[in-house]
Amino acid sequence: MGRLALDRETARSFARVALDNILRRYPYKLDHMMASAGDLAEPAAWHPVFCGSYDWHSSVHMHWLLVRLLALSPDLEEAPRIRAALDAQLRPEHIAVELAYFQRPHSRTFERPYGWGWMLKLQAELLALARQDAQAATWAEACAPLASHLSRQLADFLDAAVFPVRTGTHYNSAFALVMAMAYARTHQDLTLRRAIVRRAHRWFGHDQKYPARYEPGGDEFLSGGLTEAVLMHAVMDGCAFSEWWELFVPGQAELANWLTPVEVTNRSDPKTSHLDGLNLSRAWCWRMLEPALPDPLRPLAIRAWSDHLEASLPQAVEGEYVSTHWLASFAVLALAEPIGG
């Protein structure tokens, strides 16, 4: 899809940044509800696996990135380091502590839904790699209790949730469901899959003329509208999606807003720098949607994919830590996510 690709040198640079991130303990943004003074502890005490990479969810998807790179390039020069790091991190005794944190009365909604979606995406990647890699099978087995817990929690939450969150930040409903759907398919989790499909249709199935002119918000790293479209593509067959898209797509003037990369004016600001993530996630969305779009729009989608990548791809490895602790994962989604996956 265009001239940009996840070439070997790019994969190596992503591997190096991810390896550095998952082992970097500080700075760390701890999202922690304390019930008493006894709950004060260093992040690693609560999160022995996901205590690096600035925050919990970024650590999770940096682990996913490493697994994905192993799947894409098993002979990568950094592969031995990746395997050693994952072997040290993804151990049953460590995952048991992570699971216990989610089972605390005050932590039941911790990282919902973004971190939940990424953890399920990580487990989906481990399960896929485990089909041909015995070492990955041990990592998948170690992570299974946490993934199973979050799958049940997410299905229960979806049964009770009435309204979606459409903002393009960590609380976005559609993005979490796209990530979780990968697990539901790979693990053949029919309960979760049905919950996702049912809620996606109820939340987004009747949307029309999406107001793309209202995007983006100043700290958004997701397009609420494009991400919603990726979700609906994942839960519909081709004909149904084509009919849905015809009603959903913004008018031509507004659609141009999604086709043009956003300008990032302050890359040292943790919130403003989210806009680099928006460029990369839009590229991912266009990659996933392009084959299912009407013929006149497909060349525009390919051009948008390329333009958005060129605008922000360098920040994944060359930017400040507020960017490099997370952007490479979205770069790989945009460059190498299986279409329809």
Question: Which residues does each predicted region cover?
Answer:
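Low-complexity, Ser/Thr/Pro/Gly-enriched N-terminal "stalk/linker" regions
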Residues: G2-C51, E320
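Well-ordered alpha-helical scaffold segments within catalytic/enzyme domains
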Residues: G2-L6, H63-L76, G117-Q135, A176-Q188, ...
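Solvent-exposed loop and edge beta-strand segments that line ligand/cofactor-binding
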Residues: R3-R8, A44-V60, A100-W116, A160-S173, ...
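Extended, well-ordered alpha-helical scaffold segments
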Residues: D7-A18, E77-E93, Q132-F157, D189-D207, ...
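Mature extracytoplasmic or organellar-lumen-exposed domains after removal of signal/transit peptides
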Residues: Y28-G38, V49, H201, G205, ...
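Extended ligand-binding groove/face enriched in aromatic
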Residues: V60, L69-A184
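Loop-centered beta-sheet repeat module
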Residues: L150-L226
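Non-catalytic carbohydrate-binding regions of carbohydrate-active enzymes
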Residues: K209, W245-S281, R287-L327
